UniProtKB/Swiss-Prot annotation:
Signal peptide: none annotated. This is ilv operon leader peptide. Transmembrane segments: none annotated. GO terms for biological process: amino acid biosynthetic process; branched-chain amino acid biosynthetic process; transcriptional attenuation. It comes from Escherichia coli (strain K12). The gene is ilvL.
Length: 32
């Protein structure tokens, strides 16, 4: 379970790092 959780967390982090920057910049500039 721990290994699975680590793999899942790594995948989620990688996906977030890939997806968030452009969306975060757009949302940040749009809201702020």
């Amino acid at each position: 379970m721990t290994a699975l959780l680590r793999v899942i967390s790594l995948v989620v982090i990688s996906v977030v790092v890939i997806i968030i920057p452009p969306c975060g910049a757009a949302l940040g500039r749009g809201k702020a």
